[in-house]
Amino acid sequence: MPDKPKSLIAGSTGLVGSLLLKDLSSGDEPIVLISRKANQFLTKNTSEIIINFDDLLSDTFDLSEEIDHVYLCLGKKLFTYELGYMPEKNRDTFKKIDFDYPLAIAKLAFQNGAKSIAIVSAIGAKEGSPNYYFHIKGKLENAIKEIGFENVCIAQPGHLL
């Protein structure tokens, strides 16, 4: 009997990720969470890897898990005005959380066997947009598409408050 498919969720303590975790946890397929802090809603089919997300950006981080599906629900909480104009001082942190970390996780998951990926992006995402927020979201979408996953699902909701 083949092993059950294993899912990885990054961002399971946020709005979208917590709802996704609740939905996936109702089944019996194994789920691995990558988190910066402990998730208080673990079930029998979930395991958790607590990390400093900056470690993802090093060449030495090893996921050590075979993955079938990956869900990227990471995102920096923003003030509404940052959707229209993001101050220079906030851009590095935003890019790290909304581009660098998700891309690193996607690449690691792909290296560990993931065939499909779903990401939470934003309506209006477009690399090259003069709006920094939409530019970074579009840049991530394009980078994810280039990795080689068999299936890519990009959700583009309006801004999540």
Identify the function of each model-found stretch:
Residues A118-I136:
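Catalytic loop of short-chain dehydrogenase/reductase
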